[in-house]
């Protein structure tokens, strides 16, 4: 089973409540505003601030697919 991209319509960043982008290659949900990447483990997004990975400015401006 793969991550259901339909969930993107209802998921939001737990920090700023903003839009998340799906990075299929990295299996992460990206919040460009907070520069945080949330992992997807076993097709389940881990939307916990303390589990998020900080990303640099260059990564946060890239469009993920």
Curated annotation (Swiss-Prot):
Q: Name one Pfam family in it.
A: Trm112p
- Record-annotated membrane-spanning stretches: none
Report the domain of life of the source organism. Answer: Bacteria
**Cellular component, GO annotation:** cytosol
Per its UniProt record, what InterPro entries does this chain match? Trm112-like
> What family does this chain come from, according to its entry?
Belongs to the UPF0434 family.
Protein name from the UniProt record: UPF0434 protein CPS_2127
According to its UniProt entry, this protein's organism is: Colwellia psychrerythraea (strain 34H / ATCC BAA-681)
